[in-house]
Curated annotation (Swiss-Prot):
Disordered, as annotated region: 307-326
GO molecular function: cytokine activity; hormone activity; signaling receptor binding
The protein's role, per its UniProt record: Lineage-specific cytokine affecting the proliferation and maturation of megakaryocytes from their committed progenitor cells. It acts at a late stage of megakaryocyte development. It may be the major physiological regulator of circulating platelets.
InterPro entries linked to this entry: 4_helix_cytokine-like_core, EPO/TPO_CS, EPO_TPO, Thrombopoietin
PROSITE patterns (UniProt xref): EPO_TPO
Spans traversing the lipid bilayer: none
Family per similarity comment: Belongs to the EPO/TPO family.
Name of this protein: Thrombopoietin
Organism (species): Rattus norvegicus (Rat)
Main location: secreted
GO cellular component terms given for this protein: extracellular region; extracellular space
GO biological process, one term: positive regulation of megakaryocyte differentiation
Glycosylation sites: 197, 206, 235, 249, 256
Amino acid sequence: MELTDLLLVAILLLTARLTLSSPVPPACDPRLLNKLLRDSYLLHSRLSQCPDVNPLSIPVLLPAVDFSLGEWKTQTEQSKAQDILGAVSLLLEGVMAARGQLEPSCLSSLLGQLSGQVRLLLGALQGLLGTQLPPQGRTTAHKDPSALFLSLQQLLRGKVRFLLLVEGPALCVRRTLPTTAVPSRTSQLLTLNKFPNRTSGLLETNFSVVARTAGPGLLNRLQGFRAKIIPGQLNQTSGSLDQIPGYLNGTHEPVNGTHGLFAGTSLQTLEAPDVVPGAFNKGSLPLNLQSGLPPIPSLAADGYTLFPPSPTFPTPGSPPQLPPVS
């Protein structure tokens, strides 16, 4: 693997490391500017080690890298960003054009490494300033390959450095605000309102089913509801109805509310003391104060009973039949 490929891999790893180590753009990390300055000086020093460095056959256009602090202060933030992006983009085009004129050589390898550094700088600046199309700035034509390396150094020491040190903190804060912004209370309420109220819908469905149930009264409704219970489902038993007496409660003794659906052994306890009259929206009947049960309706709704009464239940008042003890 050539030295150029190794440098490109190192640049990619550095970019990924700077991106993952902090939530801010890579240009906001001061280590990036220091690294680019150090590498540009080192790369330029290696140019003297290449034999037969000749001028380019075709001059390349390079950006004007002269810097004036007074002129810099009079420019707007947008004009500064466009000026720097245009200069770095033009420098990258000049380096690629110069390398395209050369055969594989020491100078060509150095120009490849230089293009990698310029690409890294351009990507970092675009992450901070955006990818807006920069205007065409002032250019100068050069045939000396050394001018390519010097242009990068002057850009880093001048416009890029002042941008990152003076304008950079405010730009970095502005770029990181969208990723750390907390949604407002209004958006949270709107998001919560999108979810259906499943609890209220379930209660409404249950109330409507009970309200449409026709039968002699609350006792038949409860009996019909009990008749629909699957044996063994509530108490995790696997026997049939004939084999398991008292299958609803799963025990052979009166139970509390923890071992069955209904507590007690007599249907007299199934009176509705906890049911508030008028709790059901439609079809609710007034309770008979003497028996605790609603009167028999004169007409069944729709001509049928949704939960028919079970013929296997004992009559009210009769004690449960316990199996003989062997």
